[in-house]
């Protein structure tokens, strides 16, 4: 992974494990995932300190990156492209494929003030290239499924729905709980009528690997539900549609079949503002998404200056677990050493050491 990231111009960094509660809560409804830290002498008195002022273990690598960029903005060259492979901690219930401590592999591009849309094509292609390297170890082919928050939001507002974040959170559950249950939740928690819920599910059914086909399907659905093209809602949706069509078409020109438009992709976190991605492996539907991310314009700022970004993240521990237990990957040697210098008896050890050192001197690390 690191080799592919660096070939594409990404710089490796490592950030501290501990962040302030205020930083960790930037991503929205994530408090249940955060492990807070206390000194032993403070146990029982933690409630005296607001969560925002306490320290906790980072649950992803995006929040630490946003803090890092703001702190070091004067020394960074923008757009800042970074890779990071590091442990994170999350309040999960341990089970197969779910860990409280695990390794993530992230790539992000951060701009200063603005960030061109073409990075929303570049990042999924880099990640697909990196995952392609793992096919030698039994990993199936990976495909990125992309959507755009503006497209979804514009469509929902065109239907007359106001709780857009709520709708996105429920649509994000579609693969887990099914269409009927999502429709029920949309009516009960988001104030949708049955017709509006049905329209949301119809949008989620749209997939395409061609920008023109995607636009035709979307416009037909808008027309069927009375969303007119001169409305503010359609204008917002069209911005997202144009970006998504560009991603699909440009990705197809470079690496056919690697990225498709899939309008059920929602990403429940509320800080995404544009493209959103989920990545699936062929023949491994039960595994779910193995790599996800999106565009965020408001996560990092310094005064009036914003640092928009786009990123993707692999849950590496979960992926390696799948490769070992399902895909048939295995260690091909018990030691990283490629040569064994045998020692037949202790009298021969000095000579063996000299031979080993001579061999090592020939290797350029």
Please report, for each region that a protein language model flagged, where it lies by residue:
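Charged, often glycine-rich, active-site loop that binds/positions anionic groups
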Residues: 21-39
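Positively charged, Gly/Ser-enriched RNA/tRNA-binding surfaces
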Residues: 1-8, 19-22, 30, 50-52, ...
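Conserved phosphate-binding loops in nucleotide/dinucleotide-binding enzymes
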Residues: 37-41, 47-57, 301
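Amphipathic alpha-helical blocks
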Residues: 9-14
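Glycine-rich, mobile lid/loop segments that gate access to catalytic sites or pores
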Residues: 146-153
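Acidic, His- and aromatic-enriched active-site or binding-groove loops in soluble protein domains
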Residues: 33-47, 161-182, 281
């Amino acid at each position: 992974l690191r080799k592919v990231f660096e070939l594409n111009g990404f710089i490796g960094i490592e950030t501290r494990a501990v962040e302030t509660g205020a930083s960790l809560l930037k991503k929205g409804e994530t408090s249940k995932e955060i492990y807070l830290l206390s000194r032993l002498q403070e146990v029982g008195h933690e409630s005296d300190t607001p969560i925002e002022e306490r320290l906790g273990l980072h649950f992803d690598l995006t929040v630490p990156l946003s803090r890092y960029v703001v702190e070091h903005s004067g020394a960074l060259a923008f757009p800042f492209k970074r890779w990071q492979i590091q442990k994170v901690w999350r309040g999960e219930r341990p089970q197969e494929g779910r860990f409280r401590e695990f390794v993530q592999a992230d790539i992000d591009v951060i701009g200063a003030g603005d960030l061109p849309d073409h990075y929303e094509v570049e990042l999924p292609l880099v990640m697909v290239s990196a995952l392609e390297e793992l096919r030698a170890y039994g990993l199936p082919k990976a495909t990125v499924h992309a959507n755009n928050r503006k497209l979804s939001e514009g469509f929902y507002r065109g239907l007359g729905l106001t709780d857009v974040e709520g709708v996105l959170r429920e649509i994000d559950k579609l693969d887990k709980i099914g269409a009927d249950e999502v429709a029920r939740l949309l009516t009960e928690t988001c104030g949708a009528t049955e017709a509006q819920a049905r329209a949301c599910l119809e949008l989620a059914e749209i997939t395409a690997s061609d920008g023109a086909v995607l636009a035709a399907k979307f416009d037909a659905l808008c027309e069927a539900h009375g969303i007119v093209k001169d409305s503010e809602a359609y204008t917002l949706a069209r911005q997202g549609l144009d970006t998504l069509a560009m991603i699909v078409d440009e990705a197809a020109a470079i690496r056919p079949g690697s990225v498709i438009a899939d309008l059920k992709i929602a990403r429940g976190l509320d800080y995404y503002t544009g493209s959103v991605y989920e990545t699936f492996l062929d023949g491994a539907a039960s595994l779910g998404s193995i790599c996800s991310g999106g565009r965020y314009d408001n996560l990092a700022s310094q005064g009036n200056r914003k640092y928009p970004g786009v990123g993707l993240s692999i849950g590496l521990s979960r992926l390696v677990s799948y490769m070992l237990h399902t895909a048939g990957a295995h260690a091909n040697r018990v030691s990283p050493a490629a040569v064994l210098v045998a020692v037949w008896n202790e009298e021969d050890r000095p000579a063996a050491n000299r031979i080993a050192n001579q061999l090592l001197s020939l290797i350029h690390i």
